């Protein structure tokens, strides 16, 4: 028996234990990624003394997500790993997730990229979001849509992308992009709210 598949099946069996827990995990696995989007918008829009650093963090995290997603897309084209619910009829895909490439877990990968940046820049709430990213990752196994190694692969790609961004000229590009994005968003909000 494949240990990766066995773990998914055992975790997924817990869906029959508690309806409330299953509903909670369903909400996390389907909509949990929105927590990162909302947090990013709050970081960008909130007033305060460290606004420039918060906005730079948002841009770096966004660049990381874009690069990691491109890598994930390329991996999925080269190697289409079947999802756990495709390989074992006992695994219940209660989210209705489509049967596309399983490796890596994009939710885990993108959550890890964002959290790495938040922790690196000491953003408020970063530790709480790190815990939530872990819960989101676990929910993907619980839902029967990913293997543990999909999660590990996602975190590994996130780490590589994080190193790439901070080890190349991308960090300076992010600074220029932050300045431009700040000017545009500030102008838009001034225009909207001064009318």
Where are the language model's segments positioned?
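Hydrophobic alpha-helical bundle signature of multipass membrane enzymes
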Residues: 1-101, 109-136
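Membrane-embedded catalytic cores of phosphoryl/pyrophosphoryl-handling enzymes
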Residues: 89, 93-195
